[in-house]
Structures are given as C-alpha cells and as structure tokens.
C-alpha cells in the first residue's frame, strides 16, 4: 500500500517550525507496511489545500 502525507499549516513553511509530525507518521506507516511515496507541505489557504489534495488523489 502507498500513502502520501499532506502537512497543513502556514507555520510549516517558515524556517522556525519543523514538521516533526510527518516524520512520526512516516515511521508509523512504515511499521504497518505502508510506503510513503510523497510528502507535501501546504499553507492554511483553503484553495491551496484543495489544490494539493486534488493533485494527491488524481492519477
């Protein structure tokens, strides 16, 4: 099984906040045999979140 992680938060796009949740989630998914093939970080804009989600689910 494959997975993509989308981290949401404008603070994650600055050099002052690290996205440690994606690292933790990747490790936990790998333990379950799920391979993470892509990670995205997107700000708080609803339009940006929608576009990122669409990109993730389209073939």
What is each model feature region?
Residues 1-59:
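Non-catalytic beta/alpha edge segments that cap or flank active sites
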């Amino acid at each position: 099984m494959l997975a993509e992680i989308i981290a949401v938060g404008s603070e994650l796009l600055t050099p002052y906040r690290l996205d440690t949740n994606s690292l933790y989630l990747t490790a936990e998914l790998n333990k379950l045999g799920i391979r993470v093939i892509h990670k995205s970080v997107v700000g708080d804009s609803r339009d940006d979140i929608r576009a990122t989600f669409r990109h993730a689910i389209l073939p």
